[in-house]
């Protein structure tokens, strides 16, 4: 997830690896510190144009089609009745952000602003009982473990009340699949999968974010480097192959983690530290369809067999998409 302010950004969370028990429970943390980056690294670029009627158009271009919440704070704003604070939802690769219209058409508009943005639609309406599939092909058996919150263990801040992240283990390397229809909005494929003993935690993982139609986000972490078979901007469906899971240390099985979130706050505080940070995202406890049960909340350290029933496809797919996937 990404949070940026003008030409500076804050990572949403960093993946941590805890090697404590045989079936390793891998943990996540939320990192909300602001980091300075160059304009070339910015996920969204803003531009402005003054029209012949003295109106000003603010536009955006970005690197993925996903939804962002943009916060504009005008330091200077003259000859227009626009609000000095604007919260705007954007999606797609480019578009109009805001148009400022002059009060006096014979004069130009004076303005300067700071922009902050974070991935996701603010407070989306979602179904808490939505049924997801396991992140593997039908018939694959997976051991489930709940991941702890590494911040509470290592950095002193408290675990979010709604914290829920699952890790799915397989005995052999296997294909990771989408748990729901959505659009791929981010892929990080940077790190070799080095199997090491005695590692307390690491932020080095290969990740993917998929945005769903209701504004929720699925973050998959722990892919084998170079194994991704989908691209940013691609629509995926339940069971669509995404890449391969990986092994984190010699004591763990091959695995992938899954976290379902939504943007619940836009109260961004640059003074936050690891110790006092609070998540801007809410966490969803998902319901899953498995071979054993059509609607179940998973229990840690239990095995489940993956299944993709037709009802899962019928929930979101169009008639054309269902026909393509052989769903009647």
PLM feature segments, named:
Residues 176, 182-185, 233-245:
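A structural signal for short beta-strand/turn segments enriched in small hydrophobics and glycine
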Residues 1-44, 60:
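Bacterial Sec-dependent N-terminal signal peptides
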Residues 216-239:
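Short histidine-centered loop motifs in beta-beta connectors
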Residues 89-203, 299-328:
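Surface-exposed, glycine-biased beta-strand/turn segments
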Residues 63-81:
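Short acidic, flexible loop segments centered on an aromatic residue
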Residues 54-58:
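Structural beta-strand segments of beta-rich domains
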Residues 132, 234, 254-328:
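Acidic, glycine-rich catalytic/binding loops that coordinate metals and/or anionic ligands
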Residues 193-198, 245-258:
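Active-site loop architecture of trypsin-fold serine endopeptidases
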């Amino acid at each position: 997830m990404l949070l940026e302010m003008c030409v500076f950004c804050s990572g949403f969370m960093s993946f941590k690896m805890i090697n404590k028990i045989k079936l390793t429970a891998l943990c996540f943390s939320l990192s909300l510190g602001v980091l300075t980056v160059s304009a070339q690294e910015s996920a969204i670029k803003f531009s402005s144009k003054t029209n012949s009627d003295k109106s000003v158009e603010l536009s955006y271009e970005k690197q993925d089609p996903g939804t962002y919440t943009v916060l504009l704070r005008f330091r200077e704003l003259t000859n227009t009745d626009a609000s000095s604070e604007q919260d705007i939802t954007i999606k797609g690769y480019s578009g109009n952000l805001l148009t400022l219209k002059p009060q006096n058409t014979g004069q130009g508009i004076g303005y300067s602003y700071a922009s902050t943005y974070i991935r996701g639609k603010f407070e989306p309406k979602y179904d808490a009982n939505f049924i997801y599939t396991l992140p593997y092909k039908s018939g694959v058996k997976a051991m489930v473990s709940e991941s702890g919150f590494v911040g509470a263990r290592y950095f002193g801040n408290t675990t979010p009340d709604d914290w829920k992240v699952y890790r799915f283990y397989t005995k052999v390397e296997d294909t990771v699949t989408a748990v729901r229809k959505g659009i791929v909005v981010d892929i990080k494929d940077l790190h070799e999968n080095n199997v090491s003993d005695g590692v307390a935690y690491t932020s080095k993982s290969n990740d993917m974010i998929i945005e769903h139609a209701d504004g929720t986000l699925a973050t998959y972490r722990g892919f084998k480097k170079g194994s991704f078979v989908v691209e940013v901007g691609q629509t995926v469906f339940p069971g669509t192959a995404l890449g391969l899971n990986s092994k984190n240390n010699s004591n763990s099985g091959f695995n992938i983690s899954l976290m379902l979130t939504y943007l619940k706050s836009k109260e961004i505080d640059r003074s936050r530290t690891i110790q006092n940070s609070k998540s801007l995202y809410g966490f969803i406890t998902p319901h899953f369809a498995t071979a054993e049960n059509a609607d179940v909340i998973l229990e840690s350290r239990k095995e489940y067999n993956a299944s993709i029933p037709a009802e899962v496809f019928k929930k979101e797919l169009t008639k054309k998409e269902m026909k393509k996937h052989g769903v009647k």
